[in-house]
Amino acid sequence: MTNWDTSSIQIYDKVIERKIRYNTTIVEHSCMLLEAKNQNIVLFHKIGTSFTMITDQNKLTIHEGSYTLAYYWKDQPYNLYIWRDKNGNYLGSYFNIVKNTCLADNLLSFEDLIIDVVVFPNGDLY
């Protein structure tokens, strides 16, 4: 059974997103809680370092100062990131296939299964 407790967090609280990669390394991001419901939460994360995802035919760069709206669901094998620039313009989306999404206190954690879908601004998928 997945641990999922929204009772101890409030809107605008700091929440740590902890991603456990397939190779067991851990990546953490400090986020702000935007919404918490029984079955899902939404986090906000400001991008501190630019990064680029490159495919055979496309490239998606998320620049420093852009932000992520991150959606997580209890008992669902995925999460969703929507990226926007500092002016709110859509940059792209990222569906992350995961397992063991847990929320306890101010920590959201999940195990990344490497299978992802990137949606580019023009609608192309990878």
Model-derived features with residue positions:
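Generic hydrophobic segment detector
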Residues: M1-T2, Q10-I11, E17-R21, N79-S93, ...
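Charge-rich, low-complexity N-terminal segments
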Residues: M1-Y67
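Residues in well-ordered beta-strands of folded domains
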Residues: R18, L34, F44, Y81, ...
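Generic structural motif
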Residues: I20-Y22, A36-N38, G48-S50, D85-N87, ...
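Short, surface-exposed coil-to-beta transition loops
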Residues: I26-S30, G65-S66, Q76-L80, F110-I114
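Intrinsic disorder and flexible coil segments
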Residues: H29, F44-H45, Y81-W83, L125
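The feature represents the first ordered module of a protein
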Residues: I54-T101
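Conserved, surface-exposed functional patches that form binding/active-site neighborhoods
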Residues: N87, G92-Y126
